[in-house]
Amino acid sequence: MKPTTEISGTIIWGEEFEVISGTLYIEDGIIVDLIEKQVSDDVIIAPCFVNAHTHIGDSVIKDPPITNLDELVRPPDGLKHRMLNKTPAVELINAMGSTLKDMKKTGTTAFIDFREGGVEGVNGLRQSLIDMGNLRSIILGRPHNDLPELLNVSDGIGLSGVNDMPLDVLQEIVSAVKKSEKPFAIHAGEKDKTDIDAAFDLEPDFIVHLTSGSSSDFKRAFDQDCNIVVCPRSNLLTGAGMPDIKGMLTSGAVVGVGTDNVMLNSTNMFDEMKFISTIFLQDDRQVFKLCTLNGAKVSNMDNEIGSIETGKMAHLMVLNRNSYNLQGVRNHLSGLVRRARPDDIIQIIGVE
């Protein structure tokens, strides 16, 4: 057993993200105690982010000209898929590795990736993860005539949408993944409503986007215990629209946040928080929850990460309260959501 370590400062504590002055005690990577006491206000200690939707594979083609959604990402002929198919595996693996390092540096402790390319695609991402310490991942593969083997090597299945393949093929995939008892997720309602009902009929664990969703769709998500993941920066960039995050939350559904395609957006969750806080919500506590605990719930990791509590893993980011950027912040949580940047981070704990 490693010796107990301690860290003191202003702590964003628990599932309600209460701002507490005190000391955390950590043993073998697990938070074992919190002692509330007045300590130096030099650092803010917060839970790391959970990025609930990424496409790490397209790290190899960052910032292409913005055309339209189908031309960029729709299989099989969208720009992304053409590039993935012709790029050597070693180049893809190196590009994904750079993105994963950037994730860690910017405060993300876990992510859910929709990984194209079948078994080879999943194995490539796993190879990129080898030297990434305790960065947690849920890799949802996309079948490429290799469904049985893919279910063995992936953590589940993530599909592009119900309109992108024949119904009988789709049903075969969904049946197999449900028998495997692994998670199944799908994009829906990104640019219009035509695929929303059919996606819900498949009973996925979560749906990505629902940008075109209505209150009845959000209620159906809640009723079916289907989580929602929004990608607002990506939606705005591609012209898909703006998700009704308030409506989703009002329905009671669990809503997580993802940065979506690396070709279009960095995996920096600080940017996503600022964007959501500015455009959609003025509730800083709720915004932070979307990007941390709710992402952990979507990934079924909320018993381990997503908030700072006894018994959970100590996946923490420590921010410099005295940085040029954070000097003068009076509300620590609001400063974290609206103002903080990756360069304010002094240390990332737990994902070394």
Regions found by a protein language model. Give the residues of each.
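Active-site core of metal-dependent hydrolases
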Residues: L135-S137, E149-K246, T250-M263
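Short active-site segment of divalent metal-dependent hydrolases/proteases
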Residues: N51, I56-D58, E190, M263, ...
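His/Asp/Glu-enriched, well-ordered alpha-helical/loop segment
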Residues: D201-L202, I245-N325
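C-terminal cap of metal-dependent C-N hydrolases
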Residues: L293, T310-E352
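Divalent metal-coordination and catalytic microenvironments
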Residues: G9-T10, L24, G29, D42, ...
